Structure formats: structure tokens, C-alpha cells
Amino acid sequence: MSSQICRSASKAAKSLLSSAKNARFFSEGRAIGAAAAVSASGKIPLYASNFARSSGSGVASKSWITGLLALPAAAYMIQDQEVLAAEMERTFIAIKPDGVQRGLISEIISRFERKGFKLVGIKVIVPSKDFAQKHYHDLKERPFFNGLCDFLSSGPVIAMVWEGDGVIRYGRKLIGATDPQKSEPGTIRGDLAVTVGRNIIHGSDGPETAKDEISLWFKPQELVSYTSNSEKWLYGDN
């Protein structure tokens, strides 16, 4: 939603600024727009109100109008720095040994790709029992902990890092419920798995978990930052 707002705001700002012929209007609006952008990030009080109070009533009215019209410019200025930065995120996804042995690698990857998410890290690894225990450390008090770790370390795992707008939250929706019997049709587990003990895939359940799991499974140099050709069609304002 915020991306759509910023794209609409940026279009309005470009149209407004390209048609502005009054130099004073342009400079005042630009200043107020810049201040509004900073105010939106909570750094300083809104400049427009101070500007209005320090001017005469006629000028004050004009300044408020100028500031109002400059708000799209403010949104345009902050969208790349804060809004998009907050939305573009990374998550850890692993295809478990059962998913690998059943030949579901391409099927699972294609579902993330078709959604528009970007693969920035991938490798095949057979994790040790100790490594599996680190991965499932938050479940160490559960009765099924040892069995879970034994299974994860029983064969090759496809470890991946995916990037995209809302990839953590939507990735979990795409995967489905932990129990495949409770997963909706159309989800990976709902379509491809049968039992909890063999639910073929793991996905980070939140930003902090994603950060921890990515750092556990990958070294920084194993992740690649790049711009795909599809991004302008997914996120662009064209």
C-alpha cells in the first residue's frame, strides 16, 4: 500500500514541479517539501507550520498551500530511502531432505519466482546434528526436538535466501501451515505434503528469525545483491 501511495505521490510531484513557473513558489514548496520529508521520519518539527507562523496572514495562507502541494514531493524524496528500504526484505527458506529426495526443488523454487521474489543465495548442504540443533534451538524443550534434528540432518537440504517486498510474511503464506492437513490448497504444504514430520520446507517466521537463520546458514559473501530485469515491472512506477 505504501509503495502505491509513494508512486502516486511521485507522479503528482513530477507533474507539479515540471509545471511550476513561479520561482518563489518552487523554492518555498521545495523547502517545505524537504522539511516535510524529514518530519515524516521524525527528525525535526514540521517546517511548514513554523514558516506560516513567521509570515503575514496572506503569506501564511500561501505557504500552507505551497506546503500542501509539496507533500507529494516529500513522499517522492523519502520513498527510496525509507519506505522501500522498510519493505524490501530477505528471508531464509530451506527445502528439507524429504522435499529434495522427492524431486520437488524446481517446483518449490518456481512458486517463489512466479510471485516475483528474487533468489539471492542458494546452496546444497547436509547439516550435522549439532548444526540442526542450532537451527531448532528455540524448540529444544519440546519432546520432538531430537527427532526433528535427526530428520534435518538425514540428507541434503537446499538452503536459500529470497528477497522481495513482504517476502517474510508472504513466504509463510506460500508455505502453508506446519501441519499439511491444515494447509490450504494452493500452498506448498497443502499441495505437496501429507504429515507434520515430513512437511518438506522451512521458512523464517519473522524479521529477527530471518536475520538469525540467514547468518547461521550463510556467510555474507555467499549472498548476492543485484537488480533483476523484472523489478521495474514489479515495483516500478512506469
Swiss-Prot record:
* Record-listed ATP binding positions: 96, 144, 172, 178, 189, 199
Which EC number(s) are documented for this chain? Answer: 2.7.4.6
Cofactor(s) this protein cannot do without: Mg(2+)
Please give one Gene Ontology molecular function term for this protein. Answer: nucleoside diphosphate kinase activity
Keywords, A to Z, come to: ATP-binding, Chloroplast, Kinase, Magnesium, Metal-binding, Mitochondrion, Nucleotide metabolism, Nucleotide-binding, Plastid, Thylakoid, Transferase, Transit peptide
**Listed GO CC annotations:** chloroplast thylakoid lumen; cytosol; mitochondrial inner membrane; mitochondrial intermembrane space; mitochondrion
| Superkingdom of origin | Eukaryota
Role of this protein: Major role in the synthesis of nucleoside triphosphates other than ATP. The ATP gamma phosphate is transferred to the NDP beta phosphate via a ping-pong mechanism, using a phosphorylated active-site intermediate. Shows the highest specificity towards GDP.
Report what the protein is called.
Nucleoside diphosphate kinase III, chloroplastic/mitochondrial
Q: Which organism is it from?
A: Arabidopsis thaliana
